């Protein structure tokens, strides 16, 4: 929502809090990352007369204008996330697109047809909620380093790769063909790669750590009937440190259970 695991995926489930139309993929095109803009990098179009930021090849201003033929007025207010942006505090927090920007992005990508306009605001809420959930999972992974440096991690950039199955997702789909009762048989509906800045110590710079997030649909919540999702978040297997962290992340609970420290 790839990591290689010997056990079943351990995925945290997040539940939608309002009615919405479930997208088949994230409608935001994260193929271009904003390394110099605090906004969620929504790719609108490639018109030749569009003014682009040369630092990230993104529009200088994302349209918040009402779309032609639009019937419902949508909010143009943007939500500020809890996710620190860039290398320093003065770069602030990442911002999410407004409902109007979300609709404009979908229309420009040809994904707006069939999406009720009155569902867009709920889609934005879910989009933001999933990103916040992913960040909380990353904070859990980074906690051991945060305790050492006393410096919170930050998000440098992120990109959407909905058409690229992670190795882990591909492996579980293959296992699902052999053991459908045990492993997932449906691919994730989206994938993001996030570049996280891990502190090397106060005033000692940052280390870039790539995280992979596979987003899965989950059975509706039994109590509320609302849609639910599973986020599988983990550091990419780019180096031995990430591989060690992934092994420890899963082996340590098993060790505690074997030692009788954790009961079923």
UniProtKB/Swiss-Prot annotation:
It holds the Pfam family Cyto_heme_lyase. It comes from the Eukaryota. Its EC number is 4.4.1.17. Belongs to the cytochrome c-type heme lyase family. Keywords: Heme, Iron, Lyase, Membrane, Metal-binding, Mitochondrion, Mitochondrion inner membrane, Repeat. Lyase that probably catalyzes the covalent linking of the heme group to the cytochrome C apoprotein to produce the mature functional cytochrome. Residues 1-21 are annotated as: Disordered. One of its GO terms (molecular function) is metal ion binding. This is Holocytochrome-c synthase. It catalyses: holo-[cytochrome c] = apo-[cytochrome c] + heme b. GO terms for cellular component: mitochondrial inner membrane.
């Amino acid at each position: 929502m790839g990591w290689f695991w010997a056990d079943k995926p351990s995925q945290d489930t997040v539940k939608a809090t309002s009615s919405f139309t479930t997208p088949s993929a994230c409608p935001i095109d994260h193929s271009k990352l904003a390394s110099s803009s605090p906004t969620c990098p929504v790719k609108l179009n490639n018109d030749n007369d569009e003014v682009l930021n040369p630092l990230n090849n993104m529009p200088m201003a994302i349209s918040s204008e009402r779309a032609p033929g639009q019937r419902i007025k949508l909010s143009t207010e943007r939500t500020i996330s809890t996710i620190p942006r860039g290398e320093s505090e003065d770069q602030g927090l990442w911002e999410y697109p407004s409902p109007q920007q979300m609709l404009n992005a979908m229309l420009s990508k040809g994904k707006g047809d069939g999406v009720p306009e009155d569902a867009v605001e709920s889609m934005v809420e879910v989009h933001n909620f999933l990103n916040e959930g992913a960040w909380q999972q990353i904070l859990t992974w980074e906690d051991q380093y945060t305790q050492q440096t006393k410096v919170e991690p930050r998000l440098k950039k992120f990109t959407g790769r909905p058409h690229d199955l992670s190795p882990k997702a591909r492996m579980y789909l293959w296992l699902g063909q052999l053991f459908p009762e045990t492993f997932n048989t449906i691919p994730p509906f989206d994938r993001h790669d996030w570049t996280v800045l891990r502190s090397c110590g106060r005033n000692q710079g940052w280390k870039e750590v790539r995280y992979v997030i596979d987003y899965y649909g989950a059975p509706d919540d039994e109590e509320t009937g609302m849609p639910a999702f599973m986020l599988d978040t983990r550091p990419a297997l780019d180096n031995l440190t990430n591989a060690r962290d992934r092994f420890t992340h899963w082996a340590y609970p098993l060790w505690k259970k074997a030692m009788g420290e954790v009961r079923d």
